[in-house]
Every structure is written in structure tokens, then in C-alpha cells.
């Protein structure tokens, strides 16, 4: 693993314009619903924040003051990722280690869990952001397989609150910033970030993935992402980056995903075409990596006689 380079690619407006011509955009109501849901917040810092001491108090505050499906009366709604990106820059939250971003309709959590386990078994210190949690909020933010402590999370919330000023943030945007803040302070060797919803406009997408994964694409969150698989796929493909591996486990992928990867110069790797696995006898399996159209990789790499997970 090497320290990740700082990417200068932040805006895919040109590519978005291309797809406005090539593919039908999601209905206005769908985009409005998505942006409305992602922009439901309270604008100004609340006096209540001064009294936030426990994690449960913080979460109750964020759930009531920053979410709810409608904009509060403090200021105007600022659509897109500009708000959360501005707070990220004030906090200097540029990851200093490789970042893996995982999107998709199904299988995101499983992929994150497998990646985290593999890296940790290889001796790397991991930071993993997932959602939703099952029992406790802390499960969303794990360092080396262990949920972050209440005190660690509340300290991060306080830093975010101090940095945001009058910039409004949603519950999930707080969650995303806190995770990366905690991983940086823990000096993680790799960050694994699961997208919450979609990809292109999700808070996780303010961080450039050194590798981006789309597990699968199907109709989900149609009110937010669109009514066709192609529309959903375009939103999820928004996590791809120029010159970086873009892995898709669905082959053939939706055309909008394929074309977006080509348009921005991402290195698209498809299951079955560029990598795959086969079952062997005696509870073993093999992994094959044979990129056909990759600009980053050449030749084949095989791993044979791998044991089945216990």
C-alpha cells in the first residue's frame, strides 16, 4: 500500500452533460426527492449543541434538527455536495491512505466486510464505514474491526460542529465526516467506505476512491435514483474516478455505467471478463485475474487452492 495521491478531479459536470444527451435523466420529481431528502437540515448551529455530552444526546439532536424530509427555516437549501465538501476542506479531511468506495444495490455490506477482514488478516489497520447499524450506531464506524467508542464519536461530532459554522449538514453527512475524521486520527492503513444511497450525490463521494466497486445494479430507491436501471446505474457509477480501477460485479453492466466509466477514463474491470473464480475439490477454490481491456494491469494472476472461509 502506498500513500494515495491527491486527485484534482472533483467535478463531473462535463460527463453529466454528456449523459443528459445520451440517456434520459431521472424524472425531475425523482431528482427533487433525492436532493430534498439529502438536504433536509437545520442551517444555524443550535444552542442545544452546547449541552450535547453523550452520543445518544448527539444522535437525538441530529435526528431531529438535521433530518425529517423538509427544510427547516434556517437559510436556504444548497443542493449537491458543496456543503459537505466545504466542511471537509475546513477540517482538512484529505485521507492519507488508500480509499475503497463500495456502491451497489445489493451486497455492499458483504463486500466491505470481506475487504476489511482480508486487509486486517494481512496486517493492515482498517477503517470501515457502513450503514445502517443493527444494534448500536457505533457499528457504522469501525477501526480494526471494532466499533468506535462513544467518546471518540462525540469528540468528532464536536469538531465537525465547530468547523461547519453556518453550513447545514444532514445526519448522514455528519456520519461520513466523523468516520473519515476518526480513521485519520487512528492512522488507518486503508479506508473502506460504503455508499449510503446512490453514489453520485452521496456524501461518501466527496472522497476520491483509489478503487471503486459497484456490486450490482437494480431498481432501488426509485423516488431518489430514477425509474430505470440505466438511471440508477448512472447514479452509482458516479463513484468512479479517472485513471482508477472501477470494479463491477454485474456483467454485462448497464450501458450507462459502462459509458460513464469510458467517458471519464476509469479502468473498468468486469466480473467474468477480467476476473473470476472456480470451485475446486477438497473445499478449495481458485481466483483468476485476467484483465482484457485494462490500462493499469497486464498479464494474468492466479491464486489456487484457496481454502473456503470457515
Predicted feature locations:
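Conserved lysine of the Walker
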Residues: 108
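Hydrophobic positions on the alpha1 helix immediately C-terminal to the Walker A/P-loop
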Residues: 111-114
